Amino acid sequence: MKELHIISFNYPYPPSYGGIIDVYYKIWALSDLGIKIHLHCFVDQVPETIDQEIEEITENVFFYEKKKNPLLYFSGIPFAAAIRDSDVLLKNLEKINAPILFEGLQTTHIIRFLKDSGHQLYLRHHNNETEYYKGLSSSEKNIFKKIVYRIESLKHKGYQKKLLKKFDVVFCLSEKEYDEVKMYSGNAQLIHIFHGNQSVKQLDKKGNYFLFHGDLTTADNKKALIETIDLFKTLPQYKLVVASDRASEDIKRKISAVENISLTPILTTENLHHLLENAHANILISYQNSGTKVKLFNTLYNSRFVIINGNITDDPILTNLCLYGANMDEIRQQIITSAEKNYDDNEKRKEILEKTHSDHAKAEQIVKIIFKN
């Protein structure tokens, strides 16, 4: 029986945002191949019960509370890594002799104690954290948060450079991250994001509205939405639906002030899929250059046209499946153009996505690398 420790930066259920979607569907796909998963989760608060969806795909689940000491911001270690430190985790790892897969650099603070442990060490590199925090700093309006994010970006630069060489293999999400890791060390492997979609939806030629969906607590998504709202103010003939269950009062006011824009909550995954299936086109904009965003896969598998800017993906094959705008003027033109078009890309997407981006194929690749003997 092949066994694997997975150390997650959070409890991976429900799989409701980018990084956690990758973690959950990776576990699901590895479990489906017969890998025995020992899951370790850093959490704000230990849950009272473990969801059946997690129990069914894991052998064990362990929880560790993140440290709540604000003085850790003054540590030389990135704050996200400093708060994820646990002696109990080390003891649990030693009880079961199996390779360890760290989900993101924020889970790697304990690696300093594992050098001579005999465990094979692997990293799922979720983001270039240096660029991620730099992007957060640029998008953030609050001056205090802007400074904190900038400092964290600088911390990550040194931390990343020092740590990446310590792993047997670093599994990268995107071409950009793959090229960056190769600069530091020769242990990079490109494994695209796990997304949970299995087949491309067969949809008719027209949808009913344009859709913007995302977590509106992040500065990047808020900035993207405000730009999109301003765009649709100039396009009163088109309806925009904003789907999010985390909209601030300020965002709600901005939406309600524009007649052709409405806000709807994302209650469940099924609810989101229903919104995607009825959309004519999706607006995906980001100001952070951090590889392919997981919501791109959700829209390509489950909806019609997808209008993107350059930061949504660095994969030319995926870009070719979308309508691209380099700036908001070009995005506006793509909205107008797509509104008049019939959607007929089902077969093209099926051919590309189901062959080159299936979760099963990616899990098989990971298994071949980790369990090569």
Q: Where in the sequence are the language-model features?
A:
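Short alpha-helical segment that forms part of, or immediately flanks, the ligand-binding pocket
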Residues: 273, 294-302, 315
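Conserved catalytic-core segment of nucleotide-activated headgroup transferases in glycan assembly
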Residues: 193-254, 263-273, 277
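N-terminal subdomain of nucleotide-sugar transferases
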Residues: 1-59, 95, 233-235
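Acceptor-binding helix/loop patch of EC 2.4 sugar-transfer enzymes
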Residues: 68-76, 122-155
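Short N-terminal targeting/anchoring amphipathic segment
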Residues: 90-109, 120-122
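Acidic donor-binding loop of glycosyltransferase active sites
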Residues: 168, 276-291, 304-305
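A charged, aromatic-enriched C-terminal amphipathic alpha-helix characteristic of glycosyltransferases
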Residues: 84, 340-373
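Donor nucleotide-sugar binding/catalytic pocket of nucleotide-sugar-dependent glycosyltransferases
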Residues: 150-200
